[in-house]
Amino acid sequence: MEENWILKKLDLRSENLGTCLAAGEWIETAGPMIESYNPTTGELIAKVQAADKKAYDWAVQSAQDAFKSWRMVPAPKRGEVVRDLGNMLREYKEPLGDLISLEMGKIQVEGWGEIQEMIDICDFAVGLSRQLYGLTMTSERPQHRMYEQWHPLGPIGIITSFNFPAAVFGWNATVAAVCGDTMIWKPSELIPLVAVAIQKLINRVMADHKLSGVFNLTVGAGEIGQQMSHDKRLPLISFTGSTPTGRKVAGAVAERLGRSIMELGGNNAIIVTESADIDMAVRAILFSAVGTAGQRCTSTRRLIAHESIIDNLIDRLTAAYKTVPLGNPLDPSTLVGPLVTERAVIKMQAAINQAQKEGGTLLVGGQPRPDIGPLFVEPAIIHMPNQSPIVREETFAPILYVMSYSELDEAIDIHNDVTQGLSSAIFTDSFRMAERFLSHSGSDCGIANVNIGTSGAEIGGAFGGEKDTGGGRESGSDAWKGYMRRQTNTLNWSDELPLAQGIEFG
C-alpha cells in the first residue's frame, strides 16, 4: 500500500513523539495524542503526541543553550549545515512530497513542488550566509569610523499553517539558521506528520555536524502557540495563519515588546483588461484559483474583468472548470484534491449561500462530492454584481468571485477595497496599464504581478503583504534582516575626544 511505503520511508510509525530537542532527543510528554487523518478518505494515518508545558520549556531551554555556541559559528559555516540539509531534502523529495499530499491533500506535483521550494530556500540561504552585509558610514568627527553590523537575534519561535507545512518552515528556519538563530517550531496540529518527518531528517544532518539544539520541535494545538507568543525568551515570533489568530499572536508579542513576522490572510485579485491575452489569463486564473483546492494564502479569490471581455472570459473559465478532475491527490491525473477539514467544507458552502443572498449567480461548481471523498467540493465561480461583504472576506476555499469594470481606475479601486493586501496581478498588453498597476497609485499589495497569476511566488523575493495580511516579510531579498539585530558602532582612533554636533563639554 502506498501509504505504508511513505510512512516507512520517512521512519514514521502508527504512534510518534512530537517533541524533539537537543541532540535529536525525542521525549515523551503528558500531552494528548493528536490524530492525523487523510482528508481524501477520512481514514486515520497515524498519531503524534503533543508537547505539554514542561516539554515546551525544555525545548526553549534547548534552543537557549544551543544559541550560545551557534551564534559564534561563522555564518558561512552555518551555511554549510544548511547546504547539507538541502541535499538531504533532495534525497527525500518524493516521499516527503507524497506525505504532504497524503496528510494535507494537495496534488502530488504540488507536494513535490513544496519540497523543491524548501530545497530552493536552502540554496538561497547558503549564498546568503556570505552576504550578511552591513554599511560603513562617514563620521563627522576626525579620525573616527562608523559602521553597522548584524548580530544573531536569539532563539525564535516559528508557527506554521497547514497549507504549506514544509515550505513556510523552510523560509523561516533556513534563513534564521544562517543568521545564527536557534528555533522552536510549532507546526499546525492538522499536519503533524510532515513536521515529524522533516525534523528527523534535520536531526541526521545535525548529527553529521555534531550539533544539537539548533532546531527544536513542539507539536501541539493553540496552547503551545500561546506560550510562544507570551514567552520573553523568544525575541521573535514568525506566525503564518488566519488574520484573527494573527491579531492575537501579534498583540501578545507586542505587549512584551517582542518582534513578530505576520503572514496572514489574502483576498487576492486578478484584473483582466481589454487588451489581455485571454488564453494566458484563463490558464493563470485556473491554476491560481483552484490549485491546492483554493487553500493558498495567494489563491485568486476575485476576478475583475473589463466589461468588453467578461462574457468571453466567463465562458472560457466555466468550460475549463467543468473539465478539472477531482480525486486522490496521489493520482497523477488529479488536479484538485480535498479541502483539509469538514469545517472548511462548511465554510465554503456558507460563503456560496451568502454570495447568492447578496445577488451573486453561481455559474459552475460549488457542489459537495461525497462520491469521491468526504471533503471534496467542486471549485466554484460566482458572478457578483458588486464587491459585496462576502466578497471582501477571505474564504479559504476554491471560490472565484467575478466582477466587471469599465475604466482601470475603477478596477484598481475595487482591487484595493478589501482589508487584505497580499498578492495581486493584472493581465494586459498595455505598457501604461501595467506600469499604472505597479505604481504608487496601483496595487496596494506586497506582491504585484503582470501577466502571471497571484500564486507561485519564487523564493528570491521577499514574501508578504500589507494591511490585514500583517506586513511581515519572509524568504528572499533582505527579509533576513528580520531575524537579526542591528548594531551601530563608532570607533575613535584619535588622541582627542570630540563630541558629535560640535558640542564642547567641560
Q: Which residues fall in each region the model found?
A:
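Conserved C-terminal structural/oligomerization subdomain of aldehyde/semialdehyde dehydrogenase
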Residues: 43-46, 211, 234, 271, ...
